[in-house]
A protein has these predicted regions:
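Alpha/beta-hydrolase active-site loop
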Residues: 82-103
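Alpha/beta-hydrolase-fold enzymes
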Residues: 124-209
């Protein structure tokens, strides 16, 4: 059966120890898949998916981004990348994991999978580091009009000026996610939009490393990332 191995490496920011996982198959390796997770979650949520792929011959690796999961050093850091240039730090950490893993499995195809915010990071990565990738898989992505993104970035900047980049902003969080449940007639929780599987919704809500309110800093970073991949 597949086996998991947890490890850490030094982030590009020079301060944090990035938490990462590798799931390896019990048998021949067909390919490698690297996962970039979404905002306000962490890689342990992907364990069943990683194990499923490993059962089909994939080595699967993933890391908790800065400000997420076990890479975050405290609750205040959740949903916060960095004081400056956080988006590029996170992409560079993904590149570090790619290089570490590709060196171990140099003779098989290497794929990058990104979900939600991870899809934006993956699109950035493909622009900046296309070498060594066989392909990219984009899940739960999107692209708002340029004017909307610019306005969101400005609002985040103003929030940073008023309250600091680590401020967990109810205003920005509502703007980003507040309308998602409106698409459904009957909702049980404010996070029903995440999945139709009620058990998974409940697990997410109960997880202290999931669902942190977006900080002004990460919102500003994401808007900058969206402008870059436009």
């Amino acid at each position: 059966m597949p086996s998991f191995h947890d490890f850490r490496f030094l982030s590009t920011d020079g301060k944090h120890k990035v938490f990462a996982r590798e799931c390896t198959p019990d048998g021949e390796v067909r390919a490698v898949l690297q996962i970039a997770h979404g905002v306000a979650e962490h890689i342990y949520r992907y364990a069943p998916f990683m194990e499923f792929l490993a059962n089909h011959g994939f080595v699967v690796v993933a890391n908790d981004h800065l400000g997420h999961g076990k890479t975050a050093e405290n609750e205040q850091e959740l949903c916060f990348f960095a004081e400056k240039d956080g988006w590029n730090d996170v992409v560079s950490d993904m590149d570090q994991l790619h290089k570490l893993t590709a060196a171990k499995y140099p003779d098989v195809p290497y794929f990058l999978f990104g979900h939600s915010m991870g899809s934006f990071l993956t699109r950035t990565y493909i622009i900046d580091h296309p070498e060594g990738l066989k392909g990219g898989i984009i899940s739960g992505t999107g692209q708002n009009p340029a004017a909307v993104v610019a306005a969101g970035k400005l609002m985040a900047k103003l929030e940073m000026i008023d309250n600091g980049p680590m401020y967990h902003s109810p205003t920005l969080d509502k703007l980003a996610f507040g309308s998602y449940n409106k698409k459904y007639d009957h909702v049980r929780t404010k996070l029903d939009w995440r999945t139709r599987d009620e058990a998974i919704v409940d697990q997410y809500i109960a997880d202290p490393l999931c669902g942190a309110m977006a900080t002004a800093g990460i919102f500003h970073d994401m808007m900058g990332g969206l402008q870059y991949i436009w």
